[in-house]
Amino acid sequence: TSTGENECGFFWGAYLNRNECYDETNGEPDVIKALIEILLDRHLVKYNSSDARAITQKKAEEPITPQEAIMRTEGTVFPVADIKDYLESIGPKKEAFLSFHFIGELIYNNFGEFFWIPTWDKFPLRAYDSSDTDRSGCLEIFEMPSKNANGEIPRGRYIAGIDPIDADTGASLFSIFVMDTFTDRIVAEYTGRPRLANDAYEISLRLLKFFNAEANYEKNLKGLFSYFDARNCLHYLCNTPQVLKDMDMVKSTNLYGNNAKGTHANLEINKWGRLLQAQYMSTRYNEGDEEDLSLKLHHIRTIPYLEECIAWNSDGNFDRVSAMGMLFI
């Protein structure tokens, strides 16, 4: 404007000034040729690099869109470019994608058994930025538990990770994810901030019982352990993972009570948890099928978790990422 108060930017895509990509008759950029070369280069990097960040770096160096030009290439281990591509593929069919999910709650019957009922007045938090909405959330199951020939859910098939809360007020969200170890897929999630912390503990306990799952959790906060202990349900919380002791990340002596369960999160452990998540996402889902090039990332159905992975930075609070870290550890 004439006052000079507004700012604007100009984006120059890598396809506009690429070496040897010009129309020889008029000297104009040959955009089609340039795009083909750029996309072929990306394909080579994506499927021939063991570094999940390599494709993100490649896109940032040779951007096709303004969003690619401002991608963060440092400070995160998550395959941001792959995640964004996946979310963009979901976008046009988002309603159909979400329609396969079960939204509801677990209720006790007269025999002390659970049954699932759908709810129409509660909604899961389906966006990473949920500060302006009701943050109570509700259970979202992507795949119902599978039973064996005896009608039982075998112990060990399902595992979980929990990022708990301790106080009834606060900004952090309670988050729990359940994974099917037979299929390597995330099958259930609850993320939210109910009125009372005990409400979140009860939701997680019912979910663990429903899947007969064992959970790793951040034991920095004591409330979850106390709640499970008071109900004689500590067998749904895993002992401190042996791998952390083997890697000298935790002390392995005189562990009892809350100290014997879960994981005491610190910078080193959290960093390793994020690395495990990134490695999971970048692993082919079906390595025995040469025609199936899908990654395990492409079988993740929780959109806000993926949004957290994109936004992750060392200064923020990313509850779903923390819960997933506990799961993979």
Question: How does the language model describe each region?
Answer:
Residues 20-23, 247-249:
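Short, solvent-exposed polar/charged micro-motifs at secondary-structure junctions
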Residues 236-287:
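Short alpha-helix plus adjacent loop in nuclease-associated cores
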Residues 3-6, 12, 21-240, 282-329:
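RNase H-like, metal-dependent nuclease domains and their acidic two-metal-ion catalytic environment used
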Residues 16-18:
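OB-fold/S1-family RNA-binding modules
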